[in-house]
Amino acid sequence: MAPNLRIKKACDAMKLLGISETKTRAFLRKLLKTYENNWDFIEEDAYKVLLDAIFDEADAQSTEKNKKEEEKKKKEEEKKSRSVATSRGRRKAPEPLVQDEEDDMDEDEFPLKRRLRSRRGRASSSSSSSSSYNNEDLKTQPEEEDEDDGVTELPPLKRYVRRNGERGLAMTVYNNASPSSSSRLSMEPEEVPPMVLLPAHPMETKVSEASALVILNDEPNIDHKPVISDTGNCSAPMLEMGKSNIHVQEWDWETKDILNDTTAMDVSPSSAIGESSEHKVAAASVELASSTSGEAKICLSFAPATGETTNLHLPSMEDLRRAMEEKCLKSYKIVHPEFSVLGFMKDMCSCYIDLAKNSTSQLLETETVCDMSKAGDESGAVGISMPLVVVPECEISGDGWKAISNMKDITAGEENVEIPWVNEINEKVPSRFRYMPHSFVFQDAPVIFSLSSFSDEQSCSTSCIEDCLASEMSCNCAIGVDNGFAYTLDGLLKEEFLEARISEARDQRKQVLRFCEECPLERAKKVEILEPCKGHLKRGAIKECWFKCGCTKRCGNRVVQRGMHNKLQVFFTPNGKGWGLRTLEKLPKGAFICEYIGEILTIPELYQRSFEDKPTLPVILDAHWGSEERLEGDKALCLDGMFYGNISRFLNHRCLDANLIEIPVQVETPDQHYYHLAFFTTRDIEAMEELAWDYGIDFNDNDSLMKPFDCLCGSRFCRNKKRSTKTMQILNKA
């Protein structure tokens, strides 16, 4: 595919996720430079590498922005606290309580007048019958004084709520203080008629605006009068005095401009008036999604604890939806353009109803009733009463949801059985790789599968019909063990054949090492003086039937070709070894587990990756090295399962007494330079036991392709004698 078409395709894919073409092209240039114009890594898994790069930078910018905002906010709070302290220092000291009526009224009148001056330009007066005045009326209207006691009666406060910087609806607060009640500085709470939040006039209410009542107190409230804050960008409906209750609107994600059913609550002065200089967010419950019939609903309850409400605010549902979709995209790689968190929750409600209707185990006779007033008491909102919310009982706990989210098929449906993965230790997930059920050539490896490569003497094209193992006479595919095959009728390795392979791998007295005149591993280092060959272990191999044979796929001599069939699981080990592979069922001795899958590389290609500091998981196919006088570089092959592979990449190392052994298997070609590397059990294995094999690593060889590491296998035959103190501590705990 031409580069321009690939760039256009990548930009189109990012546009579906709301990422601009300019940003996409900028990150593509960086990635192409990093991967040396290799598009394969960029395009795999629906541009995961590109998405990770974009969102990682976005997270970094967001973190820096939040840090700057916090510093700015901190400076503003310090400035505000200094100004408040200065103003309080200039205030006149309070007079004794025993004074004449005029002095008492002056003391009571002072904070009310100052409160009006502090909001000049935003507040206007209003009559006791709720009729509003304009600014001219406010300027020309004289103050009326009571001739009997000389007390000034203040009109009710009226403020305009700003919506996105524009003046909006008025909030009126009545001053019901009578001369007799205000002539003394009484410390008893005064009864105030309830307040009501009326629906707004036909105006569009944006979801992104705040939908909670935030109570702010600028100074200590000594007269126990209700103080209503002017929240600037608050989108609350008009606040008036009346005899009905407050109605708090609930916002729906889809119907942005339609108000849902209201939740009623009574507000008393003790609960409505802020007693400190902190912002306090009232407890809230928001309906996120529901089924079509409304029988099942998903609600979000927000009730911050006392002392933890500083700088908290209720986010809008639109912001929550976007944040959740971004999290699903980053954490779970959900890139489908039609995916929606809202749709997912609605489907969950529908599924719950379907299961409830189809369930025959028991009827829904019990329901959990949540008293929202208790939640209000716990959050510090004393005196707030809400209707009871009925929620159906749910048996899934938090740990249950974690287990469900971690149980996934890591094979992506490529194998005969599902292989789940789970992490019960921390929040890590398996590293990214492309799952493949078969090995493929990367570039230069001369691996060719052709029918002509097999002669009639090398296959059973004429002698066998269905199952070679069921035949009384051994065919050309036999290898000379017992009746000619390595497998039993049960699909296990024969005892004699398996023990021979174990002995040649572990018993130095029975090992046969072959030495190359010029070892491909040394030649690939590109040094002037080659090191002598360190030797390659000769291994016995299995020969399976193939397409040219007359038998069927069910032939007993096609065990590796039929693939995995055991119940396995990838898990995070608790002993510091990272990810591992374990069995979920008991396995007999000689059972096939899996084969090592990866990219088929030449040794020079593998060393090139090492020179470029690219991570690798190599396995050298050297079972027949040394049998030729000179092995050409392109015929010396290996497998690398780092970027493309299967579950064998999770198998950990164990020195000498591992419960798995690797055996070469010839299938598609008689050429001994390439073969399958299959893993079989060396003994009976219990369920939940970790599977491991001996990497054959020399811990004293620093020039090896597989770099030495601190071995944590725990075997008493461990070859890593020079362990660090940290390694010994881990082994002792295990």
UniProtKB/Swiss-Prot annotation:
A Pfam family reported for this protein in Swiss-Prot or TrEMBL: SET
GO molecular function, one term: histone methyltransferase activity
Record PROSITE patterns: PRE_SET, SAM_MT43_3, SET
Residues engaged in binding Zn(2+) 2: C477, C545, C549
Primary residence: nucleus
Domain Post-SET: 707-723
Domain Pre-SET: 460-563
GO BP annotation list: methylation; regulatory ncRNA-mediated gene silencing
Keywords: Chromatin regulator, Chromosome, Metal-binding, Methyltransferase, Nucleus, RNA-mediated gene silencing, S-adenosyl-L-methionine, Transferase, Zinc
Basic residues: bias regions: 113-122
Binding site for Zn(2+) 3: C464, C545, C551, C555
SMART domains referenced in this protein's UniProt entry, alphabetically: PreSET, SET
Superkingdom field: Eukaryota
Protein name, per record: Probable inactive histone-lysine N-methyltransferase SUVR1
Gene name, Swiss-Prot/TrEMBL: SUVR1
